[in-house]
């Protein structure tokens, strides 16, 4: 069976242009809706790589959210930072 990260995403959500709080809130809503609609599906969260020397706060907080939702066991089965480092692939439960 091929690795789940080689599957095309069933849905994509772009967090560009949002504040960190908006991005995390909307990402969680998106993931919960998608987990109900597409159990076992794969979705992409586009965070961007961060600007200049300011780090990547949306990416960092999104990673924390994904870990929390994975540990909770009802929404996220697994996730991976894509090679571009500007998006996550997420396997839903």
Predicted regions and their residues:
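Long, charged, low-complexity intrinsically disordered regions
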Residues: 1-93
